[in-house]
């Protein structure tokens, strides 16, 4: 095996660097003598911070520039948050390794430690995701949802500076940054179903790069990968992205995959939710079937109102 350094491309935020450094440490421990270097890359999503993601448009806002670095050979491996990765990869790139998942739940952070049930009438809640907005408003139509962009530290600061009653973030990011003590409440998946791939990392490389594939193989977690594959099949069928309030979460136990999915109106007025279970070997079929069930129950109308056309099923 070549002794040249393995170059990991990553976004430059503190959380993204933590994730890439975790992979770096794992690889250097697994392969003594291997040099792993990080290559921070600024993405379009990092540059545009004054516009809600749903209005920026497009997919891959936090990965495209990193994938371009894979294409041109300036990096060997990309470390992504799986929830940022579009459901269809560019030709020639693969996601062969998904490590064990961190906590997939959303978390409520409040200045005074209040729980969701204790939030006052008309509370101002910050979030960047239509998915969260729709689910929170479905339960609490009185809430005033404030668009909130930026990295974890920026969002925590804005909560204080802009006098918000709370913000909703991914629990995984707070835990990885050792900020779990800021969490007032872990929101159950019944209250806020997570984003596709939330809490999971994705390691992306060039197809046929045998050296990189061999190096990262020990980090792969089969159960996490099966769950994420099902979630991404759901996302792919519904042609989802930042502009669509949809969510899905799959779990694996005793070779059975159980998956919950939903599609909602942005204002939370209508929310369609279903659960399916099947053997893990049928993971992608479960994701597609769950999407079909929601479409038949009215999700097609919600998507049409957002000018989103579901991806046709491949025979």
Curated annotation (Swiss-Prot):
Binds 1 dipyrromethane group covalently. Keywords: Porphyrin biosynthesis, Transferase. One of its GO terms (biological process) is protoporphyrinogen IX biosynthetic process. One of its GO terms (molecular function) is hydroxymethylbilane synthase activity. It comes from the Bacteria. It is an enzyme of class 2 (transferase). Its EC number is 2.5.1.61. It catalyses: 4 porphobilinogen + H2O = hydroxymethylbilane + 4 NH4(+). One of its GO terms (cellular component) is cytoplasm. Its cofactor is dipyrromethane. Pfam families: Porphobil_deam, Porphobil_deamC. Gene3D superfamilies: Periplasmic binding protein-like II, Porphobilinogen deaminase, C-terminal domain. CDD domains: PBP2_EcHMBS_like. Pathway: Porphyrin-containing compound metabolism; protoporphyrin-IX biosynthesis; coproporphyrinogen-III from 5-aminolevulinate: step 2/4. The modification S-(dipyrrolylmethanemethyl)cysteine is found at residue 242. InterPro entries: HemC, Porphobilin_deaminase_cofac_BS, Porphobilin_deaminase_N, Porphobilinogen_deaminase_C, Porphobilinogen_deaminase_C_sf. The porphobilinogen subunits are added to the dipyrromethane group. Tetrapolymerization of the monopyrrole PBG into the hydroxymethylbilane pre-uroporphyrinogen in several discrete steps. Belongs to the HMBS family. Monomer. This is Porphobilinogen deaminase.
């Amino acid at each position: 095996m070549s002794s040249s350094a393995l170059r990991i491309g990553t976004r430059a935020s503190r959380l993204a660097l933590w994730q890439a450094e975790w992979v770096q440490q794992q690889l250097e421990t697994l392969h003594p003598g291997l040099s792993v270097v990080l290559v921070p890359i600024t993405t379009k999503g990092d540059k545009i911070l004054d516009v809600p993601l749903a209005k920026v448009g497009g997919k891959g806002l936090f990965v495209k520039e990193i994938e371009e670095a894979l294409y041109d050979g300036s990096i060997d491996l990309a470390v992504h948050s799986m929830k940022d990765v579009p459901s269809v990869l560019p030709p020639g790139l693969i996601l062969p390794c998904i490590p064990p998942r961190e906590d997939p739940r959303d978390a409520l952070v409040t200045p005074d430690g209040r729980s969701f049930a204790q939030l006052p009438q008309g509370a101002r809640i910050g979030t960047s995701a239509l998915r969260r907005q729709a689910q929170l408003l479905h339960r609490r139509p009185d809430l005033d949802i404030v668009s909130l962009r930026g990295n974890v530290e920026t969002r925590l600061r804005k909560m204080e500076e802009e006098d918000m009653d709370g913000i909703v973030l991914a629990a995984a990011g707070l835990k990885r940054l050792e900020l779990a003590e800021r969490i007032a409440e872990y929101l159950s998946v019944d209250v806020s179903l997570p984003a596709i791939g939330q809490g999971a990392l994705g390691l992306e490389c060039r197809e046929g790069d045998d050296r990189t594939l061999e190096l990262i193989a020990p980090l792969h977690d089969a159960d996490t990968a099966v769950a994420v594959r099902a979630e991404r099949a759901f996302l792919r069928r519904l042609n989802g992205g930042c502009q669509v309030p949809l969510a899905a979460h799959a779990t694996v136990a005793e070779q059975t995959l159980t998956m919950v999915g939903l599609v909602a109106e942005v204002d939370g007025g209508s929310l369609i939710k279903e659960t399916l279970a099947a053997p893990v070997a049928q993971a992608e079929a479960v994701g597609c079937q769950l999407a079909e069930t929601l479409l038949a129950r009215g999700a097609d109308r919600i998507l049409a109102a957002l000018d989103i056309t579901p991806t046709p099923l491949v025979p």
